[in-house]
């Protein structure tokens, strides 16, 4: 079994760490691998959930070296964090012999690449998408900004070195893998494809009674059509076509929109007005839920959306919410040009793929709502579980730890 140094700039006490990192670490430890974990924790989150993570790690024999995540001073804080990451990793390498450095995303991989020779370990670059291009396309590193341009060029150079120097690469999509195979920096390292998977034990299919109870809490009738949206409002997911679709469904069938997100009702309504698709408070229901509560709210939803702007970086996007919707038996509207979404929707028969996000596509989606809502949720869940169950991803990482020279793929090429 492998001895692994796992480095992530995300926090294990944050929602993403709880859902997308912690289960994999615990599963790998249960498979017999020995892990030392470096993560960056926000002080308030560490105070709330740190003891829970420590207890889980102690039970599984995982060593944890949490570091403080800094948010100020701007820009300088990130540099300080990177120095702290390098120091923590160097200290771990001095004290332990590792077979593998598992670096989650670019910042961690830069540290891993710098230390792999000293550690005598192989580097697993778990890239999580084309991060520099996501930052530029999302408006964080604008091309017209001197600082933005410098940061983009620096991290694209880091990216090339990471692709060239890693011993194993994990991508979220086959689309990203096929793209990397064409890069001059690619030197033949095995590339595994492990999409964002869902915890099908947590995201369970609701009973008819549970669905009725949740709708009562929302003050909605059992037969009211509900269009769902899961996740915070950000730069990746497109709200304009979602609002436009909701308005059409409202006008044709009295549908309501359910938003399970961090934003308030007023923020959702303000965003709808800004996008030229105004809604009234009666058109929507907005709930803020902890992760364990999300499945019960999804139990009220008939069909949900997963609309993302297609760009270069979207080749590497694997929406976590896709598997979570399907685990709850909820079919999905999605648009073409996003990672392996088109392939997965076809294999799972999990909803409707729109060619684009224009008005004609939104009209087509509205016309198909009743048909999608009538699909058998149990059959949908079963088909999706065979492809996107969390256990399959945990097993895939364990197989890489067992033999880093062999690629693993959960999505067919």
Model regions and ranges:
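Conserved donor-binding/catalytic core segment of Leloir-type glycosyltransferases
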Residues: 5, 221-237, 242-246
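Nucleotide-activated donor-binding/catalytic signature segment of Leloir-type glycosyltransferases, i.e.
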Residues: 261, 267-298, 303
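Membrane-proximal helix-turn-helix segments that form the acceptor-binding/catalytic region
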Residues: 87-91, 110, 114-118, 131-133, ...
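Nucleotide-sugar-dependent
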Residues: 15, 237, 287-297, 304-326, ...
